[in-house]
Structure formats: structure tokens, C-alpha cells
Swiss-Prot record:
It holds the Pfam family GreA_GreB. Necessary for efficient RNA polymerase transcription elongation past template-encoded arresting sites. The arresting sites in DNA have the property of trapping a certain fraction of elongating RNA polymerases that pass through, resulting in locked ternary complexes. Cleavage of the nascent transcript by cleavage factors such as GreA or GreB allows the resumption of elongation from the new 3'terminus. GreA releases sequences of 2 to 3 nucleotides. Residues 46-77 form a coiled coil. InterPro entries: GreA/GreB_C_sf, TF_GreA/GreB_CS, Tscrpt_elong_fac_GreA, Tscrpt_elong_fac_GreA/B, Tscrpt_elong_fac_GreA/B_C, Tscrpt_elong_fac_GreA/B_fam, Tscrpt_elong_fac_GreA/B_N, Tscrpt_elong_fac_GreA/B_N_sf. The keyword Repeat does not apply. PANTHER family: TRANSCRIPTION ELONGATION FACTOR GREA (PTHR30437:SF4). Keywords: Coiled coil, DNA-binding, Transcription, Transcription regulation. One of its GO terms (molecular function) is DNA binding. One of its GO terms (biological process) is DNA-templated transcription elongation. This is Transcription elongation factor GreA.
Amino acid sequence: MVSGRGLVVTAKMLNAKKKELQDLLDVRIPENSREIGRALELGDLRENAEYKAAREEQTRLNNMVTRLQEEIERAQVFDPTTVVAGRVSFGTVISLKNHTSGEDETYTILGPWESAPERGIISYMSPLGSNLLNRKTGEQLAFTVGEHEKVYEILSISAAEI
């Protein structure tokens, strides 16, 4: 599913991240440069809180650009037609029996960019997601997160609508 240091993503999320990068480069960094210029006009840089804040923001924005560029470079767009029925992978919906809590749970396995645990979307890189990968319906798995042991049984696997 993931080759080398690749990052599996949906086409929609890759486009969103490219737009976010463009916004940083075309809007936010130029705005920050203007803020630095205005702060410089205030004089003494040793006691210039506006200048210091603008420079800190510049560092933060540049770090965001670097991180996004690296992640976009690593991104591999997921092809939904590659989902294998009956095997957990990126792009599947998994119904589980949580034997630790006794509850039934349902998750969609996507990437870290799409992850929204509060909506039942988990990353294939998360502790649960990575332990589920390549497993089949009916399999049980047990793993530890921190000091808590988790025990699950896979009830069903289906293709997610992406």
C-alpha cells in the first residue's frame, strides 16, 4: 500500500493541501512580510514586540511551507479500484467488536490528512489503523496502546465511498 516513505492520500485531500500551500505562498507569507516591514518602521528592534511577533510568525509560516512541500512530494494518490474485498486497507470501512469495552465500532481507514476520529475516520498510520492493515473478516487482534491493552474482532470490511 505504501512504498518507501510515501504518504497515501485521497485526490481530494491532495488538492486541498496544494491549495493550502498556495495560500501560504501567495497570501500569508506576503502579508507577514508587510507586517515585518511595518514593525521595522517602528524603530528599536530590541524592544519591538511587533517585530519579534512577526518574525516568529515568519518562522512558523516557513516551517509550514517546508512541511507541506515535503508531504505533497511524498503523497501517493489512492486508487479506490485497488481495494481488495475482505482485507483491511486504505479506503475500507471496518466494523469491529471491541472486546475491551464490549461495544461495536465502525471506522473508515484513510490517511493522516483525512483523519477525523470524532467522525470515525482513522489513519492507516494510527495505532489501531496500522494494527488492522491486511487483516481479514473474523480475525481477532490484540495490541497495547500506552498501558491499555486493546482486543478487537473484525466483523466486516467494505469499500469506503471516496
